[in-house]
């Protein structure tokens, strides 16, 4: 896995880079694990825009990803595939009982290796265990927040969390964002780091490539008319005329805290994530 840099053959290739696909072993997805999902393009059931800057993009086929893992059944890695819906790769597993499943591809997991999700599973990349069975300092991903709910944390490309303490019915985990929080020891996690670690190091290079991803242009409020945005209007390049920037609906933006003041997980968070 590496990054390929383009020369300035055209303005669109200047400063552009793409990921190489030499880790992909299969081109077409497993048909039984795919489905089509209607893309709302940011509109609600009345056709009104409820989420701005969405629409267009290349048509995608969704893959069914198993975040819970079949317990106590060994599985063999059949292939490593591309998934257009996420920035990491996915691995196709063939279980001993004939079931096929997709999982997030951990770094270092190759085709032909056997992995298992079990309380007694060995400590190797791709195996899934309860948090209380994992030694301190181990890198983990696909972490559950509630037992049996399926992995919800550390699932992006290159993400890895670290188990740093165990006490009582909780374990302490340092997440990729820098946040340190408590998680029930009965929750499961997968050993290792998510693959495709260079996904965040590419340069988009041109506006059209962002449109392929289904993202539409973002227009500054200060260049709009007063009817469209609180920052709009004025003669020439006018200031926003307010003490703080606001959203199109008048709420304080750019630095305003949006987290609920009394959220259930406040007592579980030891240290908040790093600020941008």
Swiss-Prot record:
A single Pfam family it belongs to is Ribosomal_L2_C
Q: Which domain of life is it from?
A: Eukaryota
The record's SMART domains line, in alphabetical order, gives: Ribosomal_L2, Ribosomal_L2_C
Any one GO molecular function term: structural constituent of ribosome
Single biological process term from Gene Ontology: mitochondrial translation
Question: Where does the record say this protein resides?
Answer: Plastid, Chloroplast
Q: Name one GO cellular component term.
A: chloroplast
Which intervals of the chain are annotated as region Disordered? 225-256
Keyword list, A-Z: Chloroplast, Plastid, Ribonucleoprotein, Ribosomal protein
Signal peptide range equals: none
Looking up InterPro entries in the UniProt record yields:
NA-bd_OB-fold, Rib_uL2_dom2, Ribosomal_uL2, Ribosomal_uL2_bac/org-type, Ribosomal_uL2_C, Ribosomal_uL2_CS, Ribosomal_uL2_dom3, Ribosomal_uL2_RNA-bd_dom
What protein family does this chain belong to? Belongs to the universal ribosomal protein uL2 family.
Q: Which HAMAP family match?
A: Ribosomal_uL2_B (MF_01320_B)
Q: Which PANTHER family match?
A: LARGE RIBOSOMAL SUBUNIT PROTEIN UL2M, RIBOSOMAL PROTEIN L2
Q: Assembly state and interactors?
A: Part of the 50S ribosomal subunit.
From the Swiss-Prot or TrEMBL record, give the protein name: Large ribosomal subunit protein uL2c
UniProt organism field: Mesostigma viride
Give the encoding gene's name: rpl2
């Amino acid at each position: 896995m590496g990054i390929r840099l383009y020369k300035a053959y055209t303005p669109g290739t200047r400063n552009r880079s793409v990921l190489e696909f030499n880790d992909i072993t299969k081109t077409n997805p497993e048909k039984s694990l795919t489905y089509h999902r209607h893309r709302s393009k940011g509109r609600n059931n009345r056709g009104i825009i409820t989420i701005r800057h969405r629409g267009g993009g290349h048509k995608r086929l969704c893959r069914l990803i198993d975040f819970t893992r079949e317990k106590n059944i060994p599985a063999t890695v059949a292939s490593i595939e591309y998934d257009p819906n996420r920035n990491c790769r996915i691995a196709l597993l063939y279980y001993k009982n004939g079931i096929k499943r997709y999982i997030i591809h951990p770094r270092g997991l190759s085709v032909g290796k056997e992995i298992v999700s079990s309380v007694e599973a060995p400590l190797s990349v791709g195996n899934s265990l309860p948090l209380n069975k994992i030694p301190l300092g181990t890198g983990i991903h696909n972490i559950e927040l509630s037992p049996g709910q399926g992995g919800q944390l550390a699932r992006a490309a290159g993400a890895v969390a670290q188990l740093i303490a165990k006490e009582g019915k909780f374990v302490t985990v340092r997440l990729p964002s820098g946040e340190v929080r408590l998680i029930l020891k009965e929750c499961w996690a997968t050993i290792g780091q998510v693959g495709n670690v260079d996904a965040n190091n590419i340069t988009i290079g041109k506006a059209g490539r962002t449109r392929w991803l289904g993202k539409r242009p973002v227009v500054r409020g200060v260049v709009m008319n007063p009817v469209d945005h609180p920052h709009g209007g004025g003669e020439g390049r006018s200031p926003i005329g307010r003490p703080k920037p606001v959203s199109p609906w008048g709420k304080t933006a750019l630095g305003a805290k949006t987290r609920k003041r009394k959220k259930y997980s406040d007592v579980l968070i030891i240290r908040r994530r790093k600020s941008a």
